[in-house]
């Protein structure tokens, strides 16, 4: 993110006397849910609100630990998850990111795609055969998102896809699942409930 061709390097800001904090929960490095907690603590220290930040970080850590305890009691093959967006007229967009992959790994699940893609079709969806579909609502797809899931799940072509057949299509907002903040933990808890009932 911090490159000369985009917003400038960290060094260039520092040379101007502008302090820079680069989040651990970042698209630039491999991820862990614990990075979110550490960012909260670090930002609390930067803004001199350590007590409030540490209390919030402790709460987040407790939720992560509780979630990991639940996951550790389960066994079986990882469930296949598809992050889908922009469904319209039989085509869709698929997402993958380091944080979403980290979240899935923590839940004993995996993204059906190594990387995202545009212009995917229902035939692609059938081939992916996901156990769970996370339909990601986004502002840029606002015109079609309102009835996208209904249109998808009623299409005859995909009725044997496990996520459709077992009614495992979850709707989430883009920021809740694709960004790198505390809301990812909310999404992980929501997704765990679907994974638990799908396994």
Regions found by a protein language model. Give the residues of each.
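A conserved helix-loop-strand patch within extracytoplasmic ligand-binding domains
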Residues: 7, 26-52, 61-73, 78
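Binding-cleft/active-site segments that stabilize strongly anionic ligands or cofactors
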Residues: 1-27, 66-178
């Amino acid at each position: 993110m911090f490159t000369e061709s985009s917003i400038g390097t960290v060094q260039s800001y520092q040379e101007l006397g502008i302090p820079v904090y680069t989040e651990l929960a970042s698209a630039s490095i491999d991820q862990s849910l614990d990075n979110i907690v550490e960012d909260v603590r670090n930002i609390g220290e930067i803004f001199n609100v350590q007590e409030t930040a540490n209390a919030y970080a402790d709460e987040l850590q407790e939720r992560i630990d509780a979630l990991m305890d639940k996951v550790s009691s389960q066994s079986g093959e990882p469930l296949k998850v598809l992050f889908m967006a922009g469904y319209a007229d039989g085509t869709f967009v698929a997402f993958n990111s380091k944080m979403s992959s980290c979240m899935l790994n923590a839940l004993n699940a995996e993204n059906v795609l190594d990387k995202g893609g545009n212009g995917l079709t229902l035939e692609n969806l059938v081939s992916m055969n996901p156990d769970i579909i996370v339909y990601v609502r986004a502002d840029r797809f606002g015109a079609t998102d309102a009835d996208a899931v209904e249109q998808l799940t009623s299409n005859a072509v995909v009725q044997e896809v496990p996520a459709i057949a077992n009614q495992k299509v979850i709707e989430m907002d883009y920021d809740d699942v694709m960004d790198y903040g505390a809301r990812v933990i909310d999404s992980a808890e929501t997704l765990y409930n679907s994974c638990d009932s799908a396994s």
